[in-house]
Amino acid sequence: MSKLLYVRDHEGFACLTVETHRNRWFAAHIVLTKDCGCLKLLNERDLEFYKFLFTFLAMAEKLVNFNIDELVTSFESHDIDHYYTEQKAMENVHGETYANILNMLFDGDRAAMNAYAEAIMADEALQAKISWLRDKVAAAVTLPEKILVFLLIEGIFFISSFYSIALLRVRGLMPGICLANNYISRDELLHTRAASLLYNSMTAKADRPRATWIQELFRTAVEVETAFIEARGEGVTLVDVRAIKQFLEATADRILGDIGQAPLYGTPPPKDCPLTYMTSIKQTNFFEQESSDYTMLVVDDL
């Protein structure tokens, strides 16, 4: 009967589930009216870049093809199951939000959107990124290895995209998109914490890969993500590949620390990182807009 009746069996995941409930948001909360007026302020190169990023983000879950359900069923835990049910629900909200953004970027032309999505699948930078990650997913045999690859997907795979989108806030453009990016990147930070907790609490130390294997995995992940943004971000307003690489290295070190590993780079985050805007508390007039404050205030993303 213990499998049928709920009993709190993992305090950490029970707390993460509550945190997810408190921070729940919906695609309808993202109003893109002002963003439509900002489109004319983007030059052709910038508009193409952001079309590419959002198309990639909208397709990413299907492209990676990581079976989270298979991973979760490895554990007999009500709280782990409950948390990942909530996480999957939030991923659906992300997908709906990206669909709304693409609808705006392509002016409602579904045929053009589909043709563009099909065309970028031949992009070398995207193919290199997807192929690398698919190879890692396929090569992960043990449970700890699978969780570590999942951790990379949550914590590294989208960082350069989130960073680049956050630069629109620096330019005073796309308030709806920036709010969505704020929410989604914070959700992914929570998902990264969950994957770290899964690794730390649900795998035996004797079964975990060697430290050298883990560091090599993270090192190549940072290289692949850097190459991705380097290939696609050239000539885009404010996109600084060196700063993004610095942020990627700092993020990798933070995640490695979360799973009890030594830092790989010793790199601090860039001084003017646009994602630090996520940590600021905003005073919101209820009658002007919904509050975008997130109950999980991130004091230091890294």
Swiss-Prot record:
Which CDD domains does this one have? Answer: RNRR2
Keyword Membrane applies = yes
What cofactor(s) does the depicted protein rely on?
Fe cation
Keyword entries, A-Z: DNA replication, Host membrane, Iron, Membrane, Metal-binding, Oxidoreductase, Transmembrane, Transmembrane helix, Viral latency, Viral reactivation from latency
Main location as per UniProt: host cell
**Residues annotated to bind Fe cation 1:** 61, 91, 94
The entry's localization annotation reads: Host membrane
**Pfam family, any one:** Ribonuc_red_sm
Provide GO CC annotations from the record: host cell membrane; membrane
Q: Name one GO biological process term.
A: DNA replication
Residue positions annotated to bind Fe cation 2 are: 91, 154, 188, 191
Annotated InterPro entries: Ferritin-like_SF, HSV_RIR2, RNR-like, RNR_small, RNR_small_AS, RNR_small_fam
Q: Which residues form the active site?
A: 98
Description of how the protein assembles with itself and partners: Heterotetramer composed of a homodimer of the large subunit (R1) and a homodimer of the small subunit (R2). Larger multisubunit protein complex are also active, composed of (R1)n(R2)n.
Q: Which HAMAP family match?
A: HSV_RIR2 (MF_04028)
Family according to the record: Belongs to the ribonucleoside diphosphate reductase small chain family.
The protein's name: Ribonucleoside-diphosphate reductase small subunit
